[in-house]
């Protein structure tokens, strides 16, 4: 069984304008509300690909009710802990050919509410996959992912997509997969990586330190996969005009999990994940199965272990 965990979900208000003029009345070309949060995005893409999952985390208030209704209406199983305060509302604006995001503060989460979540996660079946994605609410502290990981079975496959201090903390957990981008790695190591060779080296160092597999996303330059047992690949993506990168990284995770859970090799799972992420960026919305299949033949993967 596949589970996704979103500690800091949101209702995302996506608004598209031809151009944005400050201190003036602006009219949207289109606007929509979405159930947001990285883990929720992973569950949504998995559903689009035909793979069931259960979305977990915290929801509260009218915004939380909207997310639950949205997931229920799409047939995405969910089992969130209900909290006292409202789930946040985030704004994603596309204007003047650029993306701007405004994220609201996370709600307060009580110690009792956190304990309820950890107790729920203790009961995950052996051989399950748990995808923990996104930021950690300030009320829980930067050790939240570690506390959760320590409360579940060692037989649960941990996939973690986060950044900053929570990313640094989870490296000691020996997760099955992490997926930082270049900027998150630069922040993690307080260094600048100017070449693919440097990224490969740092990826190998992370694997040697205990991370089982790592996907380093490089935007329009594709992605790198580093694993144990002399496994290293680079994926090249077609030169296309991306509509929006929002949700692309979550689609990479979902595509990888989908393929690997179906018995694909690490290489093929990586390729499918990159195809999913690229399809989402090209479409501007979370990809569907046919989008990924169409993109798959345009993704080229090379073995780079000796690079």
Curated annotation (Swiss-Prot):
- Swiss-Prot/TrEMBL catalytic activity: beta-D-fructose 1-phosphate + ATP = beta-D-fructose 1,6-bisphosphate + ADP + H(+)
GO cellular component annotations of the record: cytosol
Enzyme active site? 250 (proton acceptor)
Stored CDD domains: FruK_PfkB_like (cd01164)
| Pfam families tied to this protein | PfkB
- Return the EC number: 2.7.1.56
List positions binding ATP. 217-222, 249-250
Q: What does this protein do?
A: Catalyzes the ATP-dependent phosphorylation of fructose-l-phosphate to fructose-l,6-bisphosphate.
| Protein known as | 1-phosphofructokinase
- Source taxonomy: Bacteria, Pseudomonadati, Spirochaetota, Spirochaetia, Spirochaetales
